[in-house]
UniProtKB/Swiss-Prot annotation:
GO MF annotation list: electron transfer activity; FMN binding; oxidoreductase activity, acting on NAD(P)H as acceptor; oxidoreductase activity, acting on NAD(P)H, quinone or similar compound as acceptor
Name of the gene this protein is made from: azoR
Organism: Burkholderia mallei (strain ATCC 23344)
Family to which this protein belongs: Belongs to the azoreductase type 1 family.
Pfam family name, one: Flavodoxin_2
Name the UniProt record assigns to this protein: FMN-dependent NADH:quinone oxidoreductase
InterPro entries (alphabetical): Flavodoxin_fold, Flavoprotein-like_sf, FMN-dep_NADH:Q_OxRdtase_AzoR1, NADH:quinone_OxRdtase_FMN_depd
Function text: Quinone reductase that provides resistance to thiol-specific stress caused by electrophilic quinones. Also exhibits azoreductase activity. Catalyzes the reductive cleavage of the azo bond in aromatic azo compounds to the corresponding amines.
Reported cofactor(s): FMN
Known EC number: 1.6.5.-, 1.7.1.17
PANTHER family: FMN-DEPENDENT NADH-AZOREDUCTASE 1 (PTHR43741), FMN-DEPENDENT NADH:QUINONE OXIDOREDUCTASE (PTHR43741:SF2)
The UniProt record lists the keyword Flavoprotein: yes
Binding site for FMN: M96, Y97, N98, F99
Class of enzymatic activity (EC top level): oxidoreductase
């Protein structure tokens, strides 16, 4: 049975186009995989703290030396990693904020990027350990940035996801949403056309 993990990273609880389009993409994937299980990780509702002394200390303390507080921190990270490992397909709703990802998504990445857990260093260089999965990124943007220097989001996501082993990544863009009603309509139509082709 296929498991789909949808990660919503918008800072808006309602009406975020990245979330709405990610919902549509997940529904499309379900059509092609009857009986698929869907797990939704809402990074706004279940906010993760930014890295600090406590989190870093927990990650780098040997398991047999951790305090109860550190064990709780690592358990939360393990929960997130287990979701990734259990998923066959990953859908990330990733709005562009100030040319990059939301702080919610960056915090999520910081909580799952753990040496020896989601990646490891070898004599041949780093190796991602979350392998054999298909990932989709749905990026909603107010302006038009694909292929331009202002798009620092796409290369960052490709680099990070590839670093942990997710190398099969398809991007769906809704660009120009803030450029007027006609541009927004065109952007959403283009994104939905890409979703329909999945």
């Amino acid at each position: 049975m296929t498991t789909i993990l949808q990660i919503n990273s918008a800072a808006r609880s309602q009406g975020a186009q990245s979330t709405l389009l990610a919902d549509e993409l997940t529904a499309k994937l379900q059509q092609g995989n009857p009986g698929a299980t869907v797990k939704v990780r809402n990074l706004l509702a279940d906010a993760l703290p930014h890295l600090d002394d406590a989190v870093l200390g927990a990650f780098f303390t040997p398991a047999d030396q951790r305090s109860a507080e550190q064990n709780a921190i690592v358990a939360k990270s393990d929960e997130l990693v287990d979701e990734l490992r259990s998923a066959d397909v990953i859908v990330i709703g990733a709005p562009m904020y100030n040319f990059g990802v939301s702080s919610q998504l960056k915090a999520y990445f910081d909580w799952i990027a753990r040496a020896g857990v989601t990646f490891r260093y070898t004599s041949e260089g780093p190796e991602g350990l979350i392998k054999g999965k298909k990932a989709y990124v749905v990026s909603a943007r107010g302006g038009k940035h694909v292929g331009m220097p202002t798009d620092s989001q796409t290369p960052f996501l490709k680099t990070f996801l590839g670093f942990i082993g997710l190398t099969d990544v398809t991007f769906v863009y809704a660009e120009g949403l803030a450029l007027g009603p006609d541009a927004a309509t065109e952007a959403l139509a283009s994104a939905r056309e890409a979703i329909a082709a999945v």
